[in-house]
């Protein structure tokens, strides 16, 4: 909402793309107060129809739907990985960054960044319900987990900002 108000105050067009495992809603960029209020209302009322996350699908949609170069923001926890813990969106991110001025705002809980050494832990994906075991006693596993999202953003040459979910900014 803050980004939308800021863009509107600058007399820029504002649009929104809501996604889960698919693109759920696209509001094309426009100017005007009523359009801005529609985006805010949709943001407050949005309830995903599907579980999961597919960041690459959203980035491909952005790249195809918006033909002219634009400033765009991706707000996500970036927890969209394959079985080898590689981001599923790596290629789509590189393409979107090359086409648009894309900034990634990585929202996270600080407890997600530092995995404590407590041995085998069963974790559950909040979106899909899938469960798996993680060996937190492995230093390599902890280091890999702590560094992967930063490395992907750096490699894609995307401007990144990290927001802690426990902080209130407004």
List the model feature ranges, each with a label.
Residues 31-35, 148:
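A generic short alpha-helical patch detector that favors 3-5-residue windows
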Residues 35-70, 82-84, 108-111:
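Von Willebrand factor
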Residues 24-28, 37-42, 131-133:
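Mobile active-site "lid"/loop adjacent to the S-adenosyl-L-methionine
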Residues 1-30, 71-76, 83-84, 91, ...:
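An amphipathic, basic-hydrophobic helix/alpha-beta surface used to engage anionic
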Residues 64-68, 85-170:
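Von Willebrand factor type A / integrin I
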Residues 74-77, 105-107:
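Conserved beta-strand segments of the P-loop GTPase G domain that flank and frequently precede/overlap
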Residues 1, 55-59, 90, 153:
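Short, well-ordered alpha-helical scaffold segments within catalytic/effector domains
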């Amino acid at each position: 909402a803050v980004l939308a108000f800021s863009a509107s105050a600058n007399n820029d067009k504002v649009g929104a793309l809501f996604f889960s495992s698919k693109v759920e809603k696209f509001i094309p960029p426009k100017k005007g107060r009523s359009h801005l209020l529609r985006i805010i209302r949709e943001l407050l009322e949005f309830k995903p129809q599907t579980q999961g996350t597919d960041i690459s699908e959203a980035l491909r949609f952005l790249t195809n739907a918006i033909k002219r170069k634009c400033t765009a923001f991706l707000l996500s926890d970036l927890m969209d990985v394959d079985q080898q813990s590689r981001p599923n969106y790596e290629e789509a991110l590189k393409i979107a960054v090359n086409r648009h001025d894309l900034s990634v705002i990585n929202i996270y809980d600080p407890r997600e960044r530092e995995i404590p050494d407590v041995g085998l832990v069963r974790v559950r994906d909040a979106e899909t319900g899938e469960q798996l075991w993680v060996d937190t006693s492995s230093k390599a596993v902890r280091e890999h987990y702590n560094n992967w999202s930063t490395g992907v953003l750096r490699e894609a040459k995307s401007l990144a900002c990290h927001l802690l979910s426990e902080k209130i900014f407004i």
